[in-house]
């Protein structure tokens, strides 16, 4: 099933010159969303993760649905100050500044096999920081899954070459 028709292009959002790829129509379509879960579920069958890690915020939608579907746990990676208790964090650079991501310090104890998911792979800065955070927390990253990849922005090259990456929709 071609999912591309379920992605809405929003020009000049969130700022002029940006073409935002909105997954909202995909989320509203049960057949389309079911296909996303089937394809990402195939990654779970192949890589046998113990946990799904999802990146704030749309990665939570993808990750919790996939984890529920596959009957495995979900771990959120969040912006700073959103998780209670002890956390591990990583600072990373953005195009115009920096940001920070955090994970519960005990979330990946015992070196679980982890599949990282998000809605979008663009420049790869957030994904790369999440990979480093997973490793710092003790997880064994076995793969990455994205609904959309903006290939021209080079995000895939920011990820470890030995980690399989699957994107369901690739825009060049």
From Swiss-Prot:
Gene3D superfamilies registered for this protein in UniProt: 3.40.50.2020
UniProt-listed Pfam families: Pribosyltran
GO CC annotations on file: cytoplasm
Reactions performed catalytically: AMP + diphosphate = 5-phospho-alpha-D-ribose 1-diphosphate + adenine
GO molecular function list: adenine binding; adenine phosphoribosyltransferase activity; AMP binding
Biological process according to GO: adenine salvage; AMP salvage; purine ribonucleoside salvage
UniProt-listed InterPro entries: Ade_phspho_trans, PRibTrfase_dom, PRTase-like, UPRTase/APRTase
Enzyme class, spelled out: transferase
Positions of disulphide bridges: none
Keyword Cytoplasm attached: yes
The EC number(s) this enzyme carries: 2.4.2.7
Main location: cytoplasm
UniProt keyword Glycosyltransferase, yes or no: yes
UniProt pathway annotation: Purine metabolism; AMP biosynthesis via salvage pathway; AMP from adenine: step 1/1
Location of this chain's protein in the cell: Cytoplasm
Key words of the record: Cytoplasm, Glycosyltransferase, Purine salvage, Transferase
PANTHER family in alphabetical order: ADENINE PHOSPHORIBOSYLTRANSFERASE
Subunit structure, interactors included: Homodimer.
Family in the record: Belongs to the purine/pyrimidine phosphoribosyltransferase family.
Function, as annotated: Catalyzes a salvage reaction resulting in the formation of AMP, that is energically less costly than de novo synthesis.
HAMAP family: Aden_phosphoribosyltr (MF_00004)
Protein name listed in UniProt: Adenine phosphoribosyltransferase
Gene field: apt
């Amino acid at each position: 099933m071609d999912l591309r028709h379920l992605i809405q292009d929003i020009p000049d959002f969130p700022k002029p010159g940006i073409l935002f790829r909105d997954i909202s129509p995909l989320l509203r379509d049960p057949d389309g969303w079911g296909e996303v879960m089937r394809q990402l579920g195939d990654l779970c069958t192949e890589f046998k993760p113990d946990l799904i890690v999802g990146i704030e915020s749309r990665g939570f939608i993808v990750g919790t649905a996939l984890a529920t579907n596959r009957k495995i746990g979900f771990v959120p990676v969040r912006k700073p100050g959103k998780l209670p208790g002890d956390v591990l964090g990583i600072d990373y650079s953005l195009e115009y500044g920096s940001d920070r991501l955090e994970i519960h310090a005990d979330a990946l104890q015992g070196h679980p096999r982890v599949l990282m998911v998000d809605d979008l792979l663009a420049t790869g800065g957030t994904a790369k920081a999440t990979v480093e955070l997973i490793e710092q927390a003790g997880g064994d990253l076995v793969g990455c899954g994205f609904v959309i990849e903006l290939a021209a922005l080079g995000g895939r090259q920011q990820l470890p070459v030995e980690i399989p990456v699957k994107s369901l929709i690739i825009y060049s």
